Amino acid sequence: MTDASHISPLEQARILSEALPHMQRYDEETIVIKYGGHAMGAEETAKAFARDIVLLEQTAINPVVVHGGGPQIATMLKRLGIKSEFAAGLRITDAATIEIVEMVLAGSINKQLVGYINEAGGKAVGLCGKDGNMVTACKATRTTVDPDSRIEEVIDLGFVGEPEKVDLTLLNQLIGHELIPVLAPLATSATGQTFNVNADTFAGAVAGALKAKRLLLLTDVPGVLDKSKQLIPELSVKDARRLIADGTISGGMIPKVETCIYALEQGVEGVVIIDGKTPHAVLLELFTNQGTGTLIHK
């Protein structure tokens, strides 16, 4: 992290001058920021993120934060002796697990982030997709092919959901009124069943419904990498699909990029995958000429 005391007044003025047109570009716009569990890191990292979110609100940007919590959920499940398994990149969530997931996401991480933002001078409101029926979900389905019979089989993921509908009534009461929504990726079914939703998918659905100017996915990697492990600074949807097809984009990056494509199709102007462990990653992306991470656009 740069020590500001070593930056000359002239350099500080240059940095502020460079930021001005970007601030004007995002004036009164909504930015959805997905803050991944792996990106949270130490307490000071989370507090620095919170200060940056407050800065966005102070510059007339409307930030909406969606947080994950995979590592924290895993830690709690292990502590309670509950075995956790994954399939197709998603945590299989049985009745016992969904209680822990809800407790960690909505009761612990969410309130911690709200506290950090409020401590930094903001007015954060902690919610999850269940509040006000904000996000309605259906049971997620995935399939696998049996290696011997070659027969396609359905994977039972338990209480894992995929967003079906986003009701903006509650969010619209907060956005633009100096309040910062902080959302845990939990949703409810039409019959009231709680679902655990992948945080990237949840953020993409919310950003799409809001027609956000930007969706930022903060993760633990620099962005999308080519086959030489070098950062790809910019991709069109067409290029992204090609890189998925040829295997350049693989593993856990595939669902992230698919979320980006979905959000763009729903009206989000641009989506950026960035390393949340980089100090002030959000500010670097929004307020500097070079940005950071990988920008995906139509």
Curated annotation (Swiss-Prot):
Residues where substrate binds = G69, G70, R91, N196
MF terms from GO for this chain are: acetylglutamate kinase activity; ATP binding
Indicate whether Ribonucleoprotein appears among the record's keywords: no
Entry keyword annotation includes ATP-binding:
yes
Q: Which GO terms describe its biological process?
A: arginine biosynthetic process via ornithine; L-arginine biosynthetic process
Q: Where in the cell is it found?
A: Cytoplasm
Q: Name one Pfam family in it.
A: AA_kinase
Give the record's keywords alphabetically: Amino-acid biosynthesis, Arginine biosynthesis, ATP-binding, Cytoplasm, Kinase, Nucleotide-binding, Transferase
Q: What is its main location?
A: cytoplasm
- Which residues, by range, are in coiled-coil regions? none
Q: Which domain of life is it from?
A: Bacteria
SUPFAM superfamilies registered for this protein in UniProt: Carbamate kinase-like
* Site (Transition state stabilizer) location in chain: K34, K256
Q: Which InterPro entries match?
A: AceGlu_kinase-like_sf, AcgluKinase_fam, ArgB, Asp/Glu/Uridylate_kinase, NAGK-C
Listed GO CC annotations: cytoplasm
Record EC number: 2.7.2.8
The chemistry this enzyme catalyses reads: N-acetyl-L-glutamate + ATP = N-acetyl-L-glutamyl 5-phosphate + ADP
* Pathway noted in the entry: Amino-acid biosynthesis; L-arginine biosynthesis; N(2)-acetyl-L-ornithine from L-glutamate: step 2/4
Q: What does this protein do?
A: Catalyzes the ATP-dependent phosphorylation of N-acetyl-L-glutamate.
The entry assigns this protein to a family as follows: Belongs to the acetylglutamate kinase family. ArgB subfamily.
Q: What is this protein called?
A: Acetylglutamate kinase
The gene coding this protein = argB
